[in-house]
């Protein structure tokens, strides 16, 4: 398939372009079955080449690198300096002041005592500091996961009627969430979390934020009896049903005053990044001031609900409380899988965001192992599911964090709080915790992101709104299910209905582009050029064949109507076709036979190495003929247009 071709000139002046040497489309050297399998496995599970640092090292060095891979702290601790510690100390103290009041509030979302929220900001951050690869992420309970755990566990066991078994179910869910997370990382299946699209996450988080805020109306208004459901209709019905006698005006004044204070401090922090510490310490200041006034004026005697007693002391061992059998065992696995997935998605997204801002890399699979390990250990030390908190991580970042030591500092402060300070929270009003949670979750509602999604991709926006509406009108778990289903539906739609376009030639060039994108791109008389923007698999092969056949029919009808030359060649531009399977080849064979019956020749242009190798292996190249496979669309058009011109004369 060599020689020269003389493409016709594009200007009609009679001048001829210089001869162009036609290049043959080559198949790559055969690699062999084992090599192919090895290549696929490496690209799927080891695309980041995790073993590259082990090459050429002594056994002792390999052992050290292996330990360092599991515990990254060993690597960066050798280069740790006093300057870095100063930054980590300031950041750790700052996020500790934020996490303590948040943890007490988030524990209520999970329907557990406040101490368990504090426990979950002690052990998990210590584990993560040794095993995690993110320098900026701050670990602890978060609002969405706390609500998810509380909602799912409450549907199985009533926390008021059977608090002991409820707590055991929470620990069981935490254990299996950790197993699920660590298992994904160990098996290098981290890519699975990418199936939950960004749009679906935006919608789910926004819906969860509104649901959480509505749940806080119980403490914010001083309502004693409140619905266990999370949908907006049930919550608002419960709120207004108690409006006449169930609301407490002192509680409302406390909540509204401090919510205003918290929102003002957040506004100040956004306007001036140097004042990042103002919104960070505002929750703790709010707790201190409100607790002081409730104690002085004994507002609890006037109906203001308070936290009451919080046990002193650090985390007790809880491994004996995990259900490893019985009727709640499978429920623990189910809840742990769901909550673990959400926690993992949030943490990895946060870690990637701040890593990109500081221009360093994180290992997603190591992150999953670290997060999973800390939750497994946490379940054995009276913690519930912890993950990366966006609000704390943002404060951590702005405070000048250098390494994960900030998590250690935060954990130490929380431990000291558990040992010595928890009795002081006895008179903390529930309204202030509600105000803190409301101010925190408002940041999860990303209206700008939703507007951007609408502008870019309407199908993505459907996923976003489906998850959002599912959460606020039905339940958190249904909203998550909708998010996953729509994300998968979009993937299936893109796979089964790939984009296919007609190409035309741009004026005064040898460049061929989409005629819809470039209206001045002219189609060549007698030639139809089609580009398939996807791999051709069993799932879309029939669609590709039928779409190409439909275009041929439409072009034939147009040619007949306008007196243009009939289609004699169909060129398929295959450079975007990264792969093809047996069904794909079979569909092209059927298209070839169908076109031959209409006296139309099928031409392939620029098939990639994987595709051309399979075309040779299937004997399709012999069927279509090597002379009908070209390196470029330009080469194919040059030959085909000459033949069309000859047929016309």
UniProtKB/Swiss-Prot annotation:
Its main location: membrane. It is found in: Membrane. Keywords: Membrane, Sulfate transport, Symport, Transmembrane, Transmembrane helix, Transport. The keyword Transport applies. It is a multi-pass membrane protein. It holds the Pfam family STAS. Interacts with OASA1 through its STAS domain. This is Sulfate transporter 1.1.
């Amino acid at each position: 398939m060599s020689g020269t071709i003389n493409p016709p000139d594009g200007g009609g002046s009679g001048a001829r372009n210089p001869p162009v040497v036609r290049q043959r489309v080559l198949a790559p050297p055969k690699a062999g079955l084992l090599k192919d399998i090895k290549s696929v496995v490496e690209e799927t599970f080891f695309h980041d080449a995790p073993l590259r640092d082990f090459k050429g090292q002594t056994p002792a060095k390999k052992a050290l690198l292996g330990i360092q891979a599991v515990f990254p702290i060993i690597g960066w601790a050798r280069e740790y300096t006093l300057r870095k510690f100063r930054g980590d100390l300031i950041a750790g103290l700052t996020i500790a002041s934020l996490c303590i009041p948040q943890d007490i509030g988030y524990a209520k979302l999970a329907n557990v005592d406040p101490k368990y929220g504090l426990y979950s900001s002690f052990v998990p951050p210590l584990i993560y500091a040794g095993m995690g690869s993110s320098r900026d992420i701050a670990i602890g309970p978060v609002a969405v996961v706390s609500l998810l755990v509380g909602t799912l566990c409450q549907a199985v066991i009533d926390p008021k009627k059977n608090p002991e078994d409820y707590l055991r179910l929470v620990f069981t869910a935490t254990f299996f969430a950790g197993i699920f997370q660590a298992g994904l990382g160990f098996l290098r299946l981290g890519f699975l979390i990418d199936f939950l699209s960004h749009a679906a996450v935006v919608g789910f988080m926004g819906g969860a934020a509104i649901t959480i805020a509505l749940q806080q109306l119980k403490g914010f208004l001083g309502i004693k009896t409140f619905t266990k459901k999370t949908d907006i209709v049930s919550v608002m019905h419960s709120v207004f049903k108690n409006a006449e006698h169930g609301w407490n005006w002192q509680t409302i004044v406390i909540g509204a005053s401090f919510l205003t204070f918290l929102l003002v401090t957040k506004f100040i922090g956004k306007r001036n990044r140097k004042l990042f510490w103002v919104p960070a310490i505002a929750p703790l200041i709010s707790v201190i001031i409100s607790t002081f006034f409730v104690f002085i004026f004994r507002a609890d005697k006037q109906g203001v609900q308070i936290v009451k007693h919080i046990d002193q002391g650090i985390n007790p061992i809880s491994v004996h409380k995990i259900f490893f059998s019985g009727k709640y065992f499978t429920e623990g696995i189910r809840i742990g899988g769901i909550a673990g997935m959400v926690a993992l998605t949030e943490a990895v997204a946060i870690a990637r965001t701040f890593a990109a801002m500081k221009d360093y890399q994180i290992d997603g699979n190591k992150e999953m192992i670290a997060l999973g390990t800390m939750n497994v250990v946490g379940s054995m030390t009276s913690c519930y599911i912890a993950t990366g908190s966006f609000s704390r991580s943002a404060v951590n970042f702005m405070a000048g964090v250098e390494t994960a030591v900030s998590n250690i500092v935060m954990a130490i402060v929380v431990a000291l709080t558990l040992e010595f300070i928890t009795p002081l929270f006895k008179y903390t009003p529930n309204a202030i915790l509600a105000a803190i949670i409301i101010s925190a979750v408002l940041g999860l509602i990303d209206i700008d992101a939703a507007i951007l999604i609408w502008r870019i991709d309407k199908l993505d926006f459907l996923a976003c709104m489906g998850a959002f509406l599912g959460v606020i009108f039905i339940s958190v778990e249904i909203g998550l299910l909708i998010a996953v289903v729509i994300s998968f539906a979009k993937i299936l739609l893109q796979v089964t209905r790939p984009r296919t376009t007609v190409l035309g030639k741009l004026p005064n060039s040898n460049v061929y582009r989409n005629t819809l994108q470039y209206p001045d791109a002219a189609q060549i008389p007698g030639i139809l050029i089609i580009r398939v923007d996807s791999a051709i698999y069993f799932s879309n092969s029939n669609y590709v064949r039928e779409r190409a056949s439909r275009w041929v029919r439409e072009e034939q009808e147009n040619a007949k109507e306008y007196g243009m030359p009939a289609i004699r060649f169909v060129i398929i531009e295959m450079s975007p076709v990264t792969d093809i399977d047996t069904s794909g080849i079979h569909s092209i064979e059927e298209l070839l036979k169908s076109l031959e019956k209409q006296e139309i020749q099928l031409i392939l242009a620029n098939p990639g190495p994987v595709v051309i190798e399979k075309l040779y292996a299937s004997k399709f190249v012999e069927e279509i003929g090597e002379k009908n496979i070209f390196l470029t669309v330009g080469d194919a058009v040059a030959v085909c247009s000459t033949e069309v011109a000859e047929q016309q004369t």
